[in-house]
Regions:
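Glycine-rich, charge-decorated loop segments at or immediately adjacent to ligand/cofactor-binding or catalytic sites
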Residues: 2-7, 162, 167-179
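Short glycine-rich, flexible loops that bind phosphorylated cofactors or substrates
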Residues: 134-136
C-alpha cells in the first residue's frame, strides 16, 4: 500500500501528543508538515494505547533478565546460557522472572513491546548480562537496560545489577560505573545473586 506503519520499541506512559518536543516541532513546521506530524502522532498514540492495554493485563515481574541471545552468526551466546542458569535458579526459588527466551516463547507473531514494557515497569531488579562489551551495547540489550536506568531515576526501589564474565569490570558501559556488579566467572556467582 505504500503506507508507513510505525512500530514502537520504546513505549511510555506519556502521550507523544503531549510531548513538549512534539509540540515544538509542530509549532515550527509549515502547515503541510504539521498536518503530517499530527496524523502520524495519532497513529503512534493508538499503538501506545494498545501497548499500555496489553501490558496492563500482565502479572508483575520480580526480576528482568537482560542479555544478548545470539551472536553475529546466529548462534546462542554464552550470555544466554548463563542467564538461563540464573533464570532456572531464580524461578526454582519462586521468583517471577522475565527472560525473553522463555517469556516471549509463546508470543511469536505478536509485538513483544507490550510484554517488555510491562516487565521493565514492574520488575524491582534487572540483571544485565555481558561477556563482551559489544553484547552489553547491542541495540536491544542497551534499549532494555537504558530504559531501566531511566525508571530507576524516578523509582529508588529498582536496582540494576550488571553481571559480567571474561571482561574487565572497567570495560562495561560507563552508565554502570556506580552500580555494584557481579563477576559471573567467580565460583558461587549464581548463589551470590540469589
Amino acid at each position: 500500500t505504500g503506507k508507513k506503519v510505525p512500530t514502537c520499541h520504546r513505549s511510555s506512559f506519556d502521550s507523544v501528543l503531549e510531548d513538549s518536543d512534539f509540540e515544538q516541532a509542530c509549532e515550527n513546521a509549515d502547515g503541510i508538515a504539521r498536518k503530517v506530524y499530527r496524523e502520524e502522532a495519532k497513529e503512534i498514540e493508538e499503538i501506545r494505547k494498545g501497548i499500555i492495554e496489553v501490558s496492563g493485563k500482565e502479572q508483575p515481574y520480580d526480576i528482568f533478565i537482560c542479555y544478548k541471545e545470539t551472536d553475529e552468526n546466529g548462534d546462542r551466546t554464552i550470555d544466554s546460557v548463563i542467564a538461563q542458569d540464573v533464570y532456572d535458579a531464580l524461578t526454582a526459588k519462586g521468583y517471577r522472572v522475565f527472560f525473553s527466551r522463555i517469556t516471549l516463547e509463546d508470543k511469536l507473531g505478536r509485538e513483544y513491546e507490550p510484554y517488555i514494557f510491562a516487565a521493565l515497569n514492574s520488575a524491582k531488579i534487572m540483571l544485565a548480562f555481558g561477556t563482551d562489551f559489544e553484547y552489553f551495547n547491542a541495540v536491544w540489550v542497551k534499549n532494555e537496560w537504558s530504559r531501566y536506568l531511566k525508571l530507576m531515576a524516578s523509582d529508588k526501589s529498582k536496582h540494576l545489577i550488571p553481571c559480567y564474565k571474561d571482561i574487565d569490570a572497567y570495560d562495561m558501559p560507563k552508565e554502570f560505573a556506580k552500580l555494584q556488579a557481579q563477576d559471573m566467572g567467580k565460583v558461587g556467582a549464581i548463589q551470590d545473586l540469589l
